Curated annotation (Swiss-Prot):
Belongs to the mandelate racemase/muconate lactonizing enzyme family. GalD subfamily. Keywords: Magnesium, Metal-binding. Has no detectable activity with D-mannonate and with a panel of 70 other acid sugars (in vitro), in spite of the conservation of the residues that are expected to be important for catalytic activity and cofactor binding. May have evolved a divergent function. One of its GO terms (biological process) is amino acid catabolic process. Transmembrane segments: none annotated. The lineage of its organism: Bacteria, Bacillati, Bacillota, Bacilli, Lactobacillales. D-arabinonate binds at H209, E259, R280, H309, E336. Mg(2+) binds at D207, E233, E259. GO terms for molecular function: magnesium ion binding. InterPro entries: DgoD-like, Enolase-like_C_sf, Enolase-like_N, Enolase_C-like, Mandel_Rmase/mucon_lact_enz_CS, Mandelate_racemase_C, Mandelate_racemase_N_dom. This is D-galactonate dehydratase family member EGBG_02030.
Length: 402
């Protein structure tokens, strides 16, 4: 009689192969040949996620059947009574992805086969062009085009145009300052120059990163309409999502939102009211694969497309999961590809998807198709530096949103 498969151990691995703190999870079973890996990165508070897994989820899960993914996700998510939030959801995500990885390995199928099979041959993606000036932006976009990219997100001067000179009080509080008026003016000038040079041969998008007030966001969106953007991202913060109906009624520019969402109430209304065009969830922030598959179905029913968040603060495992879901979703829109995915990422996370000429490609290995080289991970230790870009301020010294 075959021995029942159970979770034997859960290991949390922290690493920073490209200088950004990452958290990965490895779930092992009583069969030494069967294990799974997942992404649990909440980079700004990564050690809290480690504690949540080691102290709470690990003892809760050891001895359980790793194939009962739905039951494990549901019980683990409510076992602390209080639920959602970036710490618990990222911890859950690492476990959840690892269990799906195990499921795929047991079935000897890549995840995309378990999800119903491919509906496209590769995943179209956009890449960043983060420049310090308008002229630099034009040059960098040309570089991206020469690299084969057709869809490009353009930022000038950081989020909110941080590098711009501005009128400040005599004595100002330390922080990263930005001026919304200068920022909007600079971006309009930048898109004018980009359309002059490239015409409509490429698709462009932009991330406001919640740096504007609702009225400023409406004004900015109207000014951007003539540039035919793929979408305008995070024009408003999660705390102001009720303003999206007002924004939607005053502009025809496609709207994208979602990377900061943790709670179903944050996205459900936007989807059901068709207030956004693209849902930009960060999959580990909502709890992993299990909840995301349900969200995809909800969005599909209302004609909202996916555009998963794919930043540098995500393991190669997370990028692969994004791609498995994108390649199997009929309501897929586009996927983000990080410029931070470089040689060290592939050393630490062998099997990480590759991008070529604007498309992302998966391998055909069972499960997620990505592993963790623990020896390589240890060669890139994490650090405790605070991210200064989150400490942003308006010209008068008041705190802004990052």
């Amino acid at each position: 009689m075959m021995k029942a498969l159970v979770i034997e151990d859960i290991k949390v691995i922290t690493t920073a192969p490209e200088g950004i703190n990452l958290v990965a999870v490895k779930v092992t079973t009583n069969d030494p040949s069967i294990y799974g890996v997942g992404c649990a990165t909440f980079t700004q508070r990564y050690e809290v996620v480690v504690t949540a897994i080691d102290k709470y989820l690990k003892p809760f899960l050891i001895g359980k059947d790793p194939q009962r993914i739905e039951d494990i996700w549901r019980t683990a998510s409510v076992s602390s009574y209080w639920r959602n939030g970036p710490v618990l959801n990222n911890a859950l995500s690492g476990i959840d992805m690892a269990l799906w990885d195990i499921k795929g390995k047991l079935a000897n199928m890549p995840l995309y086969q378990l999800f119903g099979g491919k509906v496209r041959d590769a995943v179209p993606a956009y890449i960043h062009a983060d420049a310090q000036s308008v002229s630099d932006a034009v040059e960098l976009v040309q570089t991206r085009v020469d690299q084969g990219w057709k869809q490009i997100r353009v930022q000038i001067g950081g989020y909110g145009g941080n590098n711009q000179a501005m009128h400040l009080p005599k004595d100002n509080t330390p922080g990263v300052y930005y001026d919304p008026d200068v920022y909007m003016k600079t971006m309009i000038e930048g898109f004018e120059k980009l359309r002059e040079k490239f015409g409509d041969s490429i698709k462009l998008c932009h991330d406001v990163h919640e740096r504007l007030s609702p009225s400023e966001a409406v004004k900015f969106a109207n000014q951007l309409e003539k540039f035919d953007l793929l979408f305008l991202e995070d024009a408003l913060p999660p705390e102001q999502v009720q303003w999206f109906e007002h924004l939607r009624s005053h502009t025809n520019i496609p709207l994208a939102m979602g990377e900061l969402f943790n709670n179903p109430h944050e996205w459900t209304g936007l989807i059901q009211n068709r207030t956004i065009d693209y849902l930009r969830l960060h999959l580990s922030q909502v709890g992993g694969i299990t909840p995301t598959r349900k969200i995809i179905s909800l969005a599909d029913a209302y004609g909202v497309r996916t555009a998963w968040h794919g930043p540098g603060d995500m393991t190669g495992i997370g990028h692969a999961v994004n791609t498995h879901l994108s390649i199997t979703s009929t309501n897929f829109g586009i996927q983000e590809w990080s410029c931070s995915i470089k040689e060290n990422t592939y050393k630490v996370f062998p099997g990480t998807p590759v991008a070529k000429d604007g498309y992302i490609y998966l391998n055909d290995q069972p499960g997620i198709g990505v592993d963790i080289d623990e020896e390589a991970a240890a060669a890139f230790p994490t650090h405790d530096r605070m991210a200064d870009w989150t400490l942003c301020r308006l010209p008068d010294g008041s705190a802004g949103r990052p």
